[in-house]
Amino acid sequence: MKKSSVGFLLLLAFALSLFAGCGGDTESTTLLSDKNVNLIFVVSPDLANDPLGDVNPATANLNNQGLQRALMLASYLKQQLLGTNNVTGIHALAPMTHLQTANQFPDMAAIGFIQQFALLNKITIQGTTDNSYPLSVGYAEGDVPAGVAVPAPYVPGAQGLAFNDTHENNIKLATGIINGKTPGFHVFSAPWETTSALLTAINTTMGYHLRLPTSFQGSNHVYALTVTPSGEARLLTFDSKLTPPDTYPVLPFSLASASCTQQNFFSYSRTNGVNGVSVPAGTNTNQTVYLIRHAEAHPSSTFEDGNFVAAGQWRALALANVLPNALRGQSSPTMVYSIDPAQSFTYAGLSVSYVRPSLTVLPYAIANNLPFNLVSSFNIGLATDPGVAKATSDFFFTGGALSNQTVLVAWEHEHFPPLLTYLLQTYYGGNYPDPALSWPHGDYDTIWTIKLDGSGNLTVDNALCEGIASIPLPKTAPEF
């Protein structure tokens, strides 16, 4: 062989070794090291980037196949990337920062794609350990979309991701984790546009010279930026090669049933002209609203992480099958509403986003191809704040936008009694005392039904329930 050829091959080998040392993108099948700072990027599908067909084009939500992939991917992440290690942090897209279709539906795919994974981890709060982990979805300053309530206050420890990182809060979050040099596993869940831009910004800001993916290959591909204690960075690609079915997930076994006896029965009505009652101006007509509580979340009275626990995943996934029976003889939901999961707070030194109501009804909306909307124009605040009850009542029961609809609403249960009390009070024109309403702390099953007829006359009761017994629910999430 000529000396020039030998020299060229040696130079090529040297160049390749340098490239590898700078963190060339390589496919990996090995566990990530718990001695490194690991940033794991789960890429959720959206309408613009959905090569595997995981999104419903009408609702911009996951379809059954997308939900199945999310459930299966959770097990892959735990088994193939983390092993026995626990996650350190989970940051997901704030849904209201990415509105899709002409109906401006929020992007719920990112938190829906990572929820099952969160429940395969553990957290200890004030002495209680359970299978759950907070999802950070909160707004950073400057990222609150128009028309969305500004946090009061902002909760930096619960910061999520903005679809367009206009104020560079995404990159500040990621580089802050890297520069903190604390080993762990930090998961980011967002669409390809957000993930790709964030990887590029990290690469530039940190001077890594990594070879980045140039196109979206589908949500089977997971990217891991792993940084050693010495500062050497590598970008690894994991291909889960999942082939989920396009049918709704089937739980491993049937859940124990429950009767509708957790609350004392009540029923109230307000009819125009009866006992001096007048229907308030602007009241909706021909409307039914089902109020349900989020899934199981409190293994003890001092446990709070903004999410529900693994037992609650059984309820959330079962709703698609049990609600039709629970609502037999009643009108079926035509749309689903919940609280903006980006609303965040602190509890016992922990910063969390209030994701559990929306994630409780997300599977039901997916199974039934229903529009999923978030209430984001006001902060949910304290249940005892009369302004919150008024804002909630006005949103759901006045203005005509929800007339002629049957709405399934997942909310925080302590807000229900003040909400219903306020709504009844708006009809007062006679000698009606305030109702003595309450919702037991351990009740995750009861359904409150509010109906407005064609004239706006009101009836409310708590006769229905989902029919799922809480206590027998498994303490670990179903695995797929």
Question: What are these model-derived regions, one by one?
Answer:
Residues 1-9:
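Bacterial N-terminal signal peptides that target proteins for export
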Residues 9-13, 17:
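Small-residue packing motifs within transmembrane alpha-helices
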Residues 16-35:
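Bacterial Sec-dependent N-terminal signal peptides
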Residues 29-175, 195, 200-402, 416-480:
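Active-site-proximal alpha-helix that buttresses catalytic centers in soluble enzyme cores
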Residues 38-40, 181-190, 287-289, 402-411:
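Generic beta-sheet signal
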